[in-house]
Curated annotation (Swiss-Prot):
The keyword Transmembrane helix does not apply. The keyword Membrane applies. The modification Phenylalanine amide is found at residue 36. Residues 40-68 form a propeptide. It is found in: Secreted; Target cell membrane. This is Amphipathic peptide CT2. Residues 1-23 form the signal peptide. Belongs to the non-disulfide-bridged peptide (NDBP) superfamily. Short antimicrobial peptide (group 4) family. Its main location: secreted. One of its GO terms (cellular component) is other organism cell membrane. The lineage of its organism: Eukaryota, Metazoa, Ecdysozoa, Arthropoda, Chelicerata. One of its GO terms (biological process) is killing of cells of another organism. It comes from Mesomexovis subcristatus (Scorpion).
Length: 68
């Protein structure tokens, strides 16, 4: 009976370790793929969308004040 409990505890700990490391590794892989992907190589400026013809200078100033 004691052996079964020990095996159960070890199995639960191992499954938790695998699930947590899977999420950690997925985060690292996603970050690396974003850095070296097609979109990651572009110069992504946060104000690129502000240079639309429909947005006035006052709107741009207001949005820049919000971003500060």
């Amino acid at each position: 009976m004691k052996t079964q409990i020990v095996i159960l505890i070890v199995a639960v700990l191992f499954l938790q370790l695998v699930s947590q490391s899977d999420a950690f590794l997925k985060g690292i892989i996603d970050t690396v793929s974003k850095l070296f992907g097609k979109r990651g190589l572009k110069n992504l400026d946060q104000y690129n969308d502000l240079f639309d013809g429909e947005i006035s200078d006052a709107d741009i100033k207001y949005l820049q004040d919000l971003m500060r």
